[in-house]
């Protein structure tokens, strides 16, 4: 079994630290501004581990960090350590869940607000060397014809090599996400990233956060143990049946 990282060892690509750090409006606004290239004034407190479920029968969704701006545009930001091979369809599902919870009965579809799903990953999902891949719906038959349905999905690659079309600040941010150190923050020459480092330091030295981290780890270990025990029990049943 892999050794548990201490809270001090976590990087921003680790979901626990990411959610704790980003559940702060000023921090999330700064990161969104670096990614999108414009200021995003949030209207309510950013939410970590926000759950959305339409019905008890539907698969629920837990957004790592969720926020809405003063124009009601929705932002879901995720970190993903491993390529699970389902990320394009997962982001489609996330986008759909945001839409389902946006309109009240009787409201017109034209009132559906824009929504962004942003995923940050330490691998190149599409193999093209880009730091940033942005997707919108468009027409196959007419190049350049956009659907303008308000849905945007962005995949950020910390291992990019092609800096065309992205800011140096975004490249430095992605580097900092993977190696969240004071040295990388200082070397970024970005006030926003240096401010982000201060937020990280506050979280890592917060006693209550440390307790939450240990509790989360213990719950995960318990789930794994229960899963192993269920697997062993099932294996014994199958063995008896075959015998």
Where in the sequence are the language-model features?
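Elongated, amphipathic alpha-helical interaction scaffolds
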Residues: 1-242
């Amino acid at each position: 079994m892999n050794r548990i990282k201490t809270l001090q060892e976590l990087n921003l690509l680790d979901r626990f630290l990411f959610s704790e750090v980003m559940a702060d409006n000023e921090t999330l606004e700064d990161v969104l501004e670096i990614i999108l290239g414009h200021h995003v004034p949030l209207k309510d407190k950013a939410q970590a581990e926000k759950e959305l479920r339409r019905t008890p029968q539907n698969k629920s969704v837990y957004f790592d960090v969720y926020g809405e701006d003063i124009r009601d545009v929705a932002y879901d930001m995720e970190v993903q350590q491993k390529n699970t091979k389902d990320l394009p369809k997962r982001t489609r599902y996330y986008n759909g869940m945001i839409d389902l919870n946006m309109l009240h009965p009787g409201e017109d579809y034209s009132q559906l607000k824009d929504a962004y799903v942003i995923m940050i990953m330490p691998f190149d999902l599409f193999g093209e060397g880009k730091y940033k891949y942005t997707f919108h719906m468009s027409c196959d038959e007419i190049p350049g014809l956009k659907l303008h349905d308000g849905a945007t999905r962005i995949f950020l690659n910390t291992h990019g090599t092609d800096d065309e079309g992205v800011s140096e600040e975004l490249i430095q941010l992605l580097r900092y996400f993977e190696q969240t150190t004071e040295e990388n923050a200082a070397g970024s020459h970005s006030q926003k990233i240096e401010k982000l480092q201060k937020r990280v330091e506050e979280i890592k030295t917060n006693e209550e956060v440390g307790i939450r981290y240990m509790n989360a780890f213990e719950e995960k270990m318990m789930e794994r143990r229960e899963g192993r025990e269920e697997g062993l029990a099932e294996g014994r049943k199958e063995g008896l049946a075959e015998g």
